[in-house]
Regions:
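Substrate-binding N-lobe of the ribokinase-like
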Residues: 1-44, 259-262
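Short acidic, glycine-rich surface-loop motifs adjacent to enzyme active sites
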Residues: 84-97
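Glycine-rich phosphate/diphosphate-binding loops that line cofactor/substrate pockets in enzymes
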Residues: 1-2, 78-86
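Conserved phosphate-binding/catalytic loop of the ribokinase/pfkB sugar-kinase fold
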Residues: 10, 34-40, 47-82
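A structural signal for isolated positions on well-ordered beta-strands in alpha/beta enzyme cores
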Residues: 6-10, 33, 87-89, 118, ...
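Conserved post-catalytic alpha-helical subdomain immediately downstream of the catalytic base
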Residues: 169, 177, 203-262
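Extended, hydrophobic alpha-helical segments in both membrane/secreted and soluble proteins
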Residues: 89, 102, 106, 117-119, ...
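Conserved phosphate/ATP/ADP-binding segment of small-molecule kinases
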Residues: 95-197
Length: 263
């Protein structure tokens, strides 16, 4: 979408790592900060597709937490490049890279440099998320983060009392600037302290593959905020971007031309 990006993570010394670097370079993503750990296996996901629908996914990877020394190396690498950055997007996939120690380092860096911090959470980690700018859980993850059972469903999110309760609790407990809850075919809910929740209906016309939709949302939202959009404008752009990528088969991206056409 026109911004510069750097990838910070830990990979193995294997063919998957080589392929990852090749793909990142092809998309002009700076992969120089990637740290190689010969004791880890680079995550490789194999999706089995039948009649344009994903049937099952097989993951080959290492999921143990990275060593504290690697977390410090990652944080130092990010610190070096933050002078020219507007935001940090943190994707927690539960693969062992986003530890509490590393997340605390990132939060400290964000505060010191005054940059926006976005996180796509993985509730199973039970990390302390207080101090972030934005989190983008789906409905299931939001309820898990709040510790509330999701035993209701309402086709109109703003009338879903349990969902409203979860949103209010997460905003207060985590001291967030924005909470964006993705709701699948119901769109997304944007919540801010002191404001009423704002519901944005989905724009997806045909859904072939939801792989990467969450990444599209958090990436587009964060870029929009960094460029000066307000929280609702950013969410609307993210909603358009997600509507484009779910209409493609496989893990896909959205181009500026496609985004403009959707708008």
């Amino acid at each position: 979408l026109g911004c510069g990006a750097r990838m910070h993570s830990v990979i193995g010394r294997d063919d998957a790592a080589k392929k990852l670097r090749t793909l990142l370079k092809a998309d002009e993503v700076d992969c120089q900060p990637l740290i190689t750990d010969a004791d880890r296996q680079t995550s490789c996901k194999t999706r089995i597709i039948a009649q344009r629908q994903q049937v099952v996914r097989v993951d080959r990877e290492t999921r143990t937490d990275i060593m504290p020394r690697l977390a410090k190396r990652l944080a130092k690498s990010i610190d070096t490049g933050l002078a020219k950055s507007n935001a940090i997007v943190i994707g927690d996939y539960g693969k062992g890279v986003i530890t509490q120690e590393y997340l605390d380092e990132l939060k400290a860096l964000g505060q010191r440099h005054g940059v926006w911090l976005s996180l796509d959470p993985k509730p199973v980690h039970s990390l302390n998320l207080r101090g972030l700018s934005l989190i983008t859980p789906n409905r299931k993850e939001a309820f898990e983060l709040a510790g509330i059972d999701d035993n209701t469903y309402h086709a109109q999110p703003l009338k879903d009392q349990n969902l409203m309760r979860v949103a209010k609790q997460l905003l207060a407990d985590l001291e967030l600037e924005v909470l964006l809850i993705t709701l699948g075919d119901l769109g997304m809910l944007v919540c801010q302290p002191g404001s009423k929740p704002f519901h944005i209906p989905t724009l997806a016309r045909e859904v072939f593959d939801v792989s990467g939709a969450g990444d599209t949302v958090i990436g587009t939202y964060t870029l929009a905020v960094a460029a000066g959009a307000d929280p609702i404008e950013a969410a609307m752009l993210a909603n358009h971007a997600a509507g484009v990528v779910v209409g493609k088969l496989g893990t896909a991206t959205v181009t500026p031309k496609e985004l403009l056409a959707s708008i």
